[in-house]
């Protein structure tokens, strides 16, 4: 039976599965290898009852490895879930490649991850065997649940394999359309560029360290001639490459092209442009192998590294060249005028745990399904709000023991990520500063390191999302307390969210000083996550927007701005609406439109 983290699926309003793995009856066929690899097993993280681990296959030969297959067995430990491979067996275990990581080029490696239970033992390091392995070795690297080093973004991240697909985090734009009229693609479709020289597909890759990475482009070229591409990293400042993309014989026949590139530490914009008038082939996906990488931030592109083509007519082009300016749903719905103003969406309440699973084991996905469908149709990113919070969580958690709550938290995160794997950003933990609304139930489940454990789970099940520690007005109140809390999480978190409610009366200099201090001490990308100014006096609201918004937008370490509502009478803070229900703007909205939203 085949097991894959991507196989968890839950239709709306039905009983969720309580098993950790979903098994589907897919026969495993014999696989042929034309080379072999060194196979290693590494413990990433270990806690009192469980662990996470990576298995890495490194091709040290001169020929490619195709369709790998490996096995391992524990004495006492047992696997409970895994990602980036297809799994079978109940000890011994078997793992085979997924559609996008089945070929390992000479000198390159792939990794997949797993989580398990120790069953009273320590975390074991079993021998990895199989037709793909020329030597079976185990890693002596062990770590505890303490903060990981900067070489790994989190203890349970899958460091060396990243898949970027259309309409998901890290996919920035296509100069053309997203289509699904030719079979054989993965994900929701493929990128079909315009038939023009220079037509491009653009991705964002975040690397925790500078170095060599292997990019693999999956494509179909049903034409009679090559449709080669020019691959540019960060506008050419970090490399220009030519990618050969010969005909595949049919638009339903998919092949891969692999190229080694140099990425810099931090955000990298990767642009593949057509070198002929026919445009590019259909592009299914981009996979990245090597080092620790995750989906990058399309909205953080500077003018020096922004993409050159402006032929895209989709709404995603605004987000790819500038930081996004987003907003939330209105009374549980998305207004028809949303994308007229905003290019990022956050569900105000619909993605909170208490809204989705008010009754234990019964999910209400319908409102979120509508929001994600709208976002995909308009090619704008979604930020989930929020996984774990001391408010608006299911009341039935109060009746459970700590271990039972731990199981429920993992199932909630797992099932959300399985249903919405293209979630760009997640407020993983909300308002955890003491005195705000920390999640006591999570501390009961995981102990004092509960924040790190929740982020570990989010990394495991949503490996391509940007994971955010979000909190209330940390610009004005409990500023130092938030900094201390964020610093303590180290590399478990990807970014911090500054809600920015209640800034009325603060000067531009005061706001900038606070943001600078958070960046200087925490060193993580910043998102302004819930900005509003509540005042029925139009001029007071306008003056505060004019003071604060330029600071947010021009700050080099603020990657995006989300406002918390925009329709008068239908916002959380009274007086914070920006347009009337009929669309008439207040002065602050007119100023936003003229200076930012229509730029």
UniProtKB/Swiss-Prot annotation:
Full protein name: Endo-1,4-beta-xylanase B
Gene (UniProt): xynB
Any one GO biological process: xylan catabolic process
Pathway linked to the protein: Glycan metabolism; hemicellulose degradation
Every CBM2 domain range: 38-136
Disulphide bond pairs: 39-133
PROSITE patterns assigned to the protein according to its UniProt record, in alphabetical order: CBM2 (PS51173), CBM2_A (PS00561), CBM6 (PS51175), GH10_1 (PS00591), GH10_2 (PS51760)
Sequence similarity: Belongs to the glycosyl hydrolase 10 (cellulase F) family.
Record bears the keyword Transmembrane helix: no
Active site: residue positions: 431 (proton donor), 530 (nucleophile)
One family name in Pfam for this protein: CBM_6
Gene Ontology molecular functions: endo-1,4-beta-xylanase activity; polysaccharide binding
Reported function: Xylanase B contributes to hydrolyze hemicellulose, the major component of plant cell-walls.
Residue ranges constituting the GH10 domain according to the UniProt record: 315-595
Presence of the UniProt keyword Ribonucleoprotein in the record: no
EC number: 3.2.1.8
């Amino acid at each position: 039976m085949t097991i894959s983290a991507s196989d968890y699926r839950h239709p709306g309003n039905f009983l969720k599965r309580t098993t950790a793995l979903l098994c589907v009856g897919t026969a495993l066929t014999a696989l042929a290898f034309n080379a072999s690899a060194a196979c290693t097993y590494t413990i990433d993280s270990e806690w009192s009852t469980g662990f996470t681990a990576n298995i890495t296959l490194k091709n040290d030969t001169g020929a490619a490895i195709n369709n790998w297959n490996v096995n391992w067995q524990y004495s006492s430990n047992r696997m409970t879930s895994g990602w980036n491979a297809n799994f079978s067996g109940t000890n011994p275990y078997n793992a085979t490649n997924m559609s996008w990581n089945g070929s390992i080029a000479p000198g390159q490696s792939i990794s997949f991850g797993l989580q398990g239970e120790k069953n009273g033992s320590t975390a074991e390091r079993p021998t990895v065997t199989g037709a793909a392995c020329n030597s079976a070795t185990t890693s002596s690297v062990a770590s505890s649940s303490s903060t990981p080093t900067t070489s790994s973004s989190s203890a349970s991240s899958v460091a060396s394999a990243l898949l970027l697909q259309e309409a998901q985090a890290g996919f920035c734009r296509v100069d053309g359309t997203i289509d699904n009229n030719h079979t054989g693609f993965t994900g929701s479709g493929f990128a079909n560029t315009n038939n023009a020289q220079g037509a491009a597909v653009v991705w964002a890759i975040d690397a925790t360290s500078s170095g060599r990475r292997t990019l693999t482009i999956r494509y179909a070229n049903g034409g009679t001639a090559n449709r080669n591409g020019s691959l540019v990293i960060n506008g050419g400042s970090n490399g220009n490459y030519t990618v050969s993309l010969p005909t595949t014989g049919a638009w339903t026949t998919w092949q891969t092209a692999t190229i080694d590139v140099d990425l810099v530490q931090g955000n990298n914009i990767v642009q593949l442009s057509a070198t002929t008038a026919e445009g590019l082939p259909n592009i299914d996906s981009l996979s990245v192998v090597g080092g620790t990488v995750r989906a990058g931030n399309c909205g953080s592109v500077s003018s020096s590294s922004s993409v050159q083509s402006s032929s895209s007519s989709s709404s995603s082009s605004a987000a790819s060249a500038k930081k996004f300016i987003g907003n939330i749903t209105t009374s549980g719905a998305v207004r028809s005028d949303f994308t007229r103003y905003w290019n990022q969406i956050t569900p105000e309440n619909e993605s909170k745990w208490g809204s989705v699973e008010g009754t234990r084991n019964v999910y209400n996905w319908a409102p979120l399904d509508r929001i994600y469908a709208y976002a995909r149709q308009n090619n704008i990113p979604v930020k989930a709000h929020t996984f774990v919070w001391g408010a608006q969580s299911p009341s039935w958690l109060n009746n459970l023991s700590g271990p039972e709550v731990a199981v429920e938290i993992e199932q909630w995160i797992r099932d959300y990520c399985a249903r919405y794997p293209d979630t760009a950003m997640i407020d993983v933990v909300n308002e955890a500063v003491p005195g705000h609304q920390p999640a006591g139930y999570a501390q009961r489940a995981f102990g004092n390191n509960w924040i790190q454990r929740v982020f570990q789970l989010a990394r495991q099940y949503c490996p391509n999302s940007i994971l955010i520690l979000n909190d209330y007005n940390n610009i004005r109140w409990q500023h130092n307390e938030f900094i201390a809390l964020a610093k303590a999480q180290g590399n478990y978190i990807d970014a911090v969210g500054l809600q920015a409610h209640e800034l009325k009366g603060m000067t531009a200099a005061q706001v900038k000083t606070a943001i600078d201090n958070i960046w200087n001490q925490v060193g993580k990308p910043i998102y302004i996550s819930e900005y509003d100014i509540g005042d029925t006096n139009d001029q007071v609201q306008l003056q505060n927007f004019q003071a604060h918004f330029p600071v947010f937008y021009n700050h080099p370490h603020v990657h995006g701005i989300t406002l918390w509502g925009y329709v008068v009478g239908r916002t959380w803070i009274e007086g914070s609406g920006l347009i009337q229900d009929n669309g008439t703007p207040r002065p602050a909205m007119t100023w936003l439109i003229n200076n930012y939203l229509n730029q």
